[in-house]
Amino acid sequence: MKKWRRSVLWLILSVCILVSGACSMKSPQQAASKANNQEIEYASNSPTMKGVTIDGARGFMWEVKNNGTTVYLVGSIHLTDDNFYPLHSKYEKVFAEADYLGLEIDFTKAPDEEQQKRIVDMMMYKDGTTLKDHVSKETYAKVKEFLMKNGLEANAYDAFKPWQVEGNISVMSLKADYNLEEGIDLYFLQKALERKIPVIGLETQESQMGALAGFSKERQEKSLNTTLDDYNSGVINDPTDELIEMWKKGDEQTLLKITNSLYSDPEYGKAMLTDRNIGMAEKIEGYLNTNKEDEYFIVVGLSIILCKLF
């Protein structure tokens, strides 16, 4: 069975802030309605991008309606390549009529001073210690080796906690021709700013970082080692090209295999996918219960939508 580099899967499919499984194929409609055991009308003509198209990247999109409110839920990947756009025209048509854009994080609102302090505290050591004091000699040596191979000072990451070091390494290990600034979420954010429609966040920077920082020091070091070993081994498949092609083609079989692989570590799967899915679903349920004839265009990490709820 193919083994994908897990840290890159997290970066592309589920987490949008690292730049600074048995998977249930339940529909997003079911995920949203499950929160309060409420019945929601599933549109029979849900515009999931299937079949052959010649009109741009297909991707994955679902529609759910309740009492006049419509939510379009787009499964996003957080980076693209130079040939990713245009998207299928259905996305542009639906977005042009949307009243709100929903994202994992509302990037138009900066954290306030207190939030910024808490975020920095989650990322960095503030007690006079450094990474070297919190991981084994072997792990620290691997980090130094990685940094020097990439032209950085051996102590460049000393101030960062293990989870942030892992994120930095994941970003640095991506090929130069991938575009972290042109993911689907940021693409539609720019369009929302141009249209001057409200942008809403289903999470915050603090809550998303909290999910990553919430693991024990030992778990963070184990995950950091996995990322370093994957990078150094040369035998682990870099999934980035395959993920991008999967999205372009709307390849559900590859999507299922990749999302399943994220649950190879159940603790990570629960914290990074299942728990976040439930929180987002509750917010989406609130939008569907406004009894207003509004349309919401919501773009979140694809693996969060298609995750195991139980």
Task: Give short role names for the model-derived ranges.
Residues 19-22:
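C-terminal motif of bacterial Sec signal peptides marking the signal peptidase cleavage site
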Residues 56-60, 280-282:
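Alpha-helical scaffolding within the catalytic cores
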Residues 24-26:
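Bacterial signal peptide processing site
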Residues 35-51, 60-271:
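Structured, acidic catalytic/metal-binding patches in enzyme active sites
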Residues 2-11:
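Bacterial N-terminal signal peptides that target proteins for export
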Residues 266-310:
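A cross-kingdom marker for long, charged
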